[in-house]
Swiss-Prot record:
Its EC number is 3.1.1.4. Its cofactor is Ca(2+). It comes from Crotalus viridis viridis. It is an enzyme of class 3 (hydrolase). It is found in: Secreted. Contains 7 disulfide bonds. This is Acidic phospholipase A2 Cvv-E6c. It comes from the Eukaryota.
Amino acid sequence: NLVQFELLIMKVAKRSGLLSYSA
């Protein structure tokens, strides 16, 4: 699911501090 993938990206982005990834 695309939503699940986006949530995962957001989680990883928050962890590594790459918020620009989800933006």
